[in-house]
Structures are given as C-alpha cells and as structure tokens.
Amino acid sequence: MENPSIDFESAEFALRQSWEIHRQAFGPILEPAFVENQQVRILLINALNHISRREVKRGMELLKEIHPHCIYDEDKAAWAFFVGLCFEMGGARDQMLEWYEKAGEIGHRFYLPYLKLAKAAHAAAQFEKAKDYYQTAIECLQEMSENDKDEIILGSAYTNLTSCLTMIHQYPEAENAWKAAQQYPAQPGADATAAILYAAMGNAEKTAEHINGLKEKFPAWVEQTQQMTGQILSGTHPAFPK
C-alpha cells in the first residue's frame, strides 16, 4: 500500500514551487498579502496558477472567494491588483486600468501597475498624470534589491518621465530625469526625447547633437524629430509657444 504522506509531500512541494514563481513575478505586492491566513494564500496561489494559464474565469472565481478575507490594506491592494491582472489577461484594458488604479489608491510598492497606468496616461496625452505614475514606478523600482532591479525598465521609465516633464514645460526637472536615464542602458530612439527637450529649452546645439545620435542609432525617427524640433525652436509648435 502506498504511503499517503508521499502525495502530501508532492503537493506541498508543488505549492512552494508555485509560490516562488509568483513571488519572483509579483513579490512586492504578493509577499505582504494575507500573511496571517495561509489558507487564503493557498487559494491565491491557485488563482494565480489559473490566471497564468489564461484560465481567467476560474481565476476570477477564486479571487471572489478570497475577497471576504481582505482585512488589511496589503490584502486589499494585492486583491485589486490581481483582479486587474485578470482583466489584462482577458484583454479588457479599461477594466485593467480601473483596478490597477484602485490598487494604487490603496497603496502598494509594486512598480508594474504604476508603469502600465503611466504608459496609458502618456498615450492619452495626460502628461501630468503620467508623470506622477512614472515617478511612483521609479521609486518602487529603486526600492528593489540590486539583484532584482531591472535597469532596462528604469532607463525606459526615466526617458518617458523626461518626455512628460518636457510636455508640461518643467525643463530643469526633465533634464534631471534625462541625466538619470543615462545611468541605465540606452533606450531605442531616446535621442528623440532629448532633442525635443533641448529644443524646448532653446538649445539648438544640443538638439542637433541628439538628432545626429538618432541618425546613427534610430534613423526611422529622424525626419519626424527634425520637423518637431524645428517648429519648437522657431516658436511655431502649438505645444511650445514662445
């Protein structure tokens, strides 16, 4: 007769393995959640297993079971984020953003939802809102350990922050963000961001320098950037009146 403890040990190993996979992906929002309720954590792991396999309906059902056990803000923020993740995996972008916003309002230190909210606001030309989200995402990234910190994402976030600050005419802050971006791997087309910033600051020499950088690294953006920076420098661009 088989020893039933073998099955128990296998299940426990699978559970620990699943937790570690999800912790690596979502650690800053997952680890503080449901610390005092291991049964709910098991339910959450199960929900995340389904969500990761794009079995969104089952994942959402399990999240609904978890909801009554959300006691602390850490529980509520994680729950709202994972509801947003369900909608994201299901292709429902508006609902995804709505729930990521709710998670942010409760408060958490996971960069990813803030970055997604920043990019959505940026694409909608809501530059002030995007700036705030980029700054929060950067703060969360900087709080991570050196081993976990993603330098490519940090460089991209700082470059996009530069763009938003430029569009709301906060040029000293934009230049500081641009200088911070230079500490990380260069982003494709980043010279376009710098060219626009320096054109807005009236620095034709630095604008030309970054357009030359574009010619070498990202020629597809040269014509559009030259046109925009030319308008900015001449005072004819509507977003940058003299």
Predicted regions and their residues:
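Start-of-helix register in tetratricopeptide repeats
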Residues: 41, 75-78, 112, 149-152, ...
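Terminal, low-structured helical/coil segments at or just beyond the last alpha-helical repeat
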Residues: 208-242
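Short coil turns that delineate tetratricopeptide repeat
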Residues: 71-74, 108, 142, 185-186, ...
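Flexible helix-coil transition and linker loops at the boundaries of alpha-helical arrays
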Residues: 24-36, 67-76, 140-151
